């Protein structure tokens, strides 16, 4: 199936979002307008099957390119602003989230697979983490679909609320607002969209916190693979689950690190950094339009009360813990 129809629709929404941001809604940002427009149009008008391949490609690939190009706009001196306290914040936040989500999943009666997918999606990077963990635990398609739907719903709520909560709690401190958004939001797109509602510096810092979480994906995949093997061995005897090597470290993280290293060592001329920022911004806006188009609100209504409790309790836990850790470690 051709990706062209879905891509062109996402691109058109990105163009409209850019114009709306430039001439009418100056404070929202093109990325935020794009995902909101996508949600509205996708749920009301654009449900054709011919669009699915293109919006799926735009959501995944363009967002990855956006993150990679961002590496040419920062240096390790920028990452150094996060410091050991920033790394400590991310590690404690991720480990605590995984423990809490697994605990709540068991208490609410969800399967071990759903709990693992929810834990990885909320702790690391949303749908991408769920897709990476799914094959190593042998999850069913229905379990993956349920987890992705809930993680995206909670991510959307956080995406729209964290900019205001961060400003209310931390004032104009971009580092702390970036830590809150980058340390709790589920997907890269939601991090960027949320931080864009604040300012460009917060977007950069939030993305750096998010990149640190993405780098931890390899360890999360290994952990859940080992955990699943142990559980199945206890239940069924010796078994073997293959872990896909290409699920470990996303290529766009490597690209980000390579470009960041080059910028640190040779210092890109302003034109190169400006071009990378331009490409990153447009890839991001088109991708977020696609994310909005693919967000099916009906799925969330069908999710059920118990799943909603699961998602909301995870959301509250993540935000409260992040606020406490940021105040203790970073502030």
From Swiss-Prot:
Entry annotated with the keyword Transmembrane helix: yes
Topology within the bilayer: Multi-pass membrane protein
One GO cellular component term: plasma membrane
Record keywords: Cell membrane, Membrane, Transmembrane, Transmembrane helix
Stored InterPro entries: UPF0324_pro (IPR018383)
TM regions (residue ranges): 2-20, 24-46, 82-104, 114-136, 148-170, 204-226, 247-269, 308-330
Localization per Swiss-Prot or TrEMBL: Cell membrane
Ranges in coiled-coil conformation: none
Similarity comment: Belongs to the UPF0324 family.
Name the UniProt record assigns to this protein: UPF0324 membrane protein YdhF
